[in-house]
Amino acid sequence: MQRINCSQGTNREVSPTDRTQALIRPYRPSDLDALYRICLLTGDDGQDATSLFSDPRLLGHFFAAPYGLFEPALAFVAEDNAGVGGYILSALDTQAFEERLERTWWPHLRARYPDPPASAPGEQLTPDQHVARMIHHPWRIPDWLAARYPSHLHIDLLPRLQAGGLGRQMTKTLIAALRGQGSPGVHLHVPGGNQHAAGFYRHIGFTELPATPDELPAPHLLLFGMDL
C-alpha cells in the first residue's frame, strides 16, 4: 500500500508548527473519520477526488484507515482551529502489515466490493473499480526492498496546511518514531509527474531507488528510500 519532531525515540508530545498554527499530535481513534475525509479530499493527485468516487469511503479503506486501525503508534495528524487537516501514516514492517490486512481487513472489503473482470482494461475502469481491483490484488513489497527499507509511509495535507514547512515537520516526527521502534529504513512512492513532491523528498534525505515496473504498485510511480 502506497500513497510525513519527536526529539528522540518514541517521544509523542504535541509539537507546534510555525506559520500554519497547527499542532502535530498522535493519532486518536476519534480521528478515523478525518483520515477518510482527508484521503478523499486529496485523492486526485493532491486535489479533491469527491466527484470521482461513488463511494466516498472507498479510497480511505485502502490508503488511510488500515494505518489508524492497525498501526496507530505510527500515525500522526496535524490539527488547527478548523480541525484535523493532515496526516502521516506508516507501517513498521510492510510485509507483516500486508499479511495482517490479508487476514483481517481485505476479506470483508472483497465481499463488499466485487473484483472487476480481469479482461477489463484499466483505462475503462471507474475510480471505484480501480480501487476495488487494488483491494482484490494489492501490491506486495519485493523482498529486496523489505530487507533494507521495511517501513513505508503516506502523507496527505489539505491545502490550508500545505505551507509553512508542516510536511517536513511531520516527516521528521514520523522518522523519529520509526527509529525509536528500530526500523532500519523507510520507503515511499511518488507519482512520476509530481516533481515537486520528488524534490521535497530528495531535499529531506530520501534517495530515488531503481525499480522495474513489476516492482512498483503502478509503472508511473517513483520509488524513494531512506536509511534510518
Task: Write out the residue ranges for each language-model feature.
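Conserved GNAT-fold acetyl-CoA-binding loop/helix
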Residues: 43-63, 101-114
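Conserved beta-strand in the GNAT
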Residues: 77, 83-92, 139
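Active-site rim helix/loop that mediates acceptor-substrate recognition in acyltransferases
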Residues: 53-75, 81, 138
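Conserved active-site alpha-helix within GNAT-family acetyltransferase domains
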Residues: 148, 153, 164, 168-169, ...
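Short hydrophobic/aromatic beta-strand element in the GNAT-like acyltransferase core
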Residues: 73-77, 87, 154, 187, ...
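Conserved GNAT acetyl-CoA-binding A-motif
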Residues: 149, 178-191
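Conserved acyl-donor/pantetheine-binding loop and adjacent beta-alpha core of acyl/acetyltransferases
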Residues: 95-154
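A short beta-loop-alpha structural element at the N-terminal edge
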Residues: 23-37
